[in-house]
Amino acid sequence: MSKLVLPAQGSCRCGEVQIQISAQPILTMACHCRGCQRMSASAFSLSAAIPTNGFEVLRGEPAIGGLRNPDLRHFFCPQCMSWMFTRFLPEFVNVRVTMLNDASWFAPFIETRTSAKLPWVSTPAIHSYSGFPPMEEYTKLTAEFSHWLSGAHQRG
């Protein structure tokens, strides 16, 4: 994994909705929950938690889809229905990294909901959780991720 080159832009599959990231992620993850499996039509979803002030929709009007819940809002392109990002805490936005023009920098630092993980799946995530990390662990995880992202993990 390397640092994300900023600003980073991306779009849905049809290009109707365009996004931009102007801040480094605070955490990267793979989620194995059944909801992510179904919404992504894959074994897991990949996302980067971006500080809210470092994320913007440049063009288009994403629509809320997936499960309707005031605390968990999944945004899709209304035209091609690509799942683009999720908002559930005011401090950050979970961006589906494959919506970015270049996702080659990405690797998941944590994996969540491994209790629903398909038996053949493996990821390079450093931390695994059968559910989600307890809220009190996020400060430690984001600090460790920042240190890891700075390249300290490569120097041994």
Where are the language model's segments positioned?
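A short Gly-Trp-Pro
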Residues: 1-11, 16-156
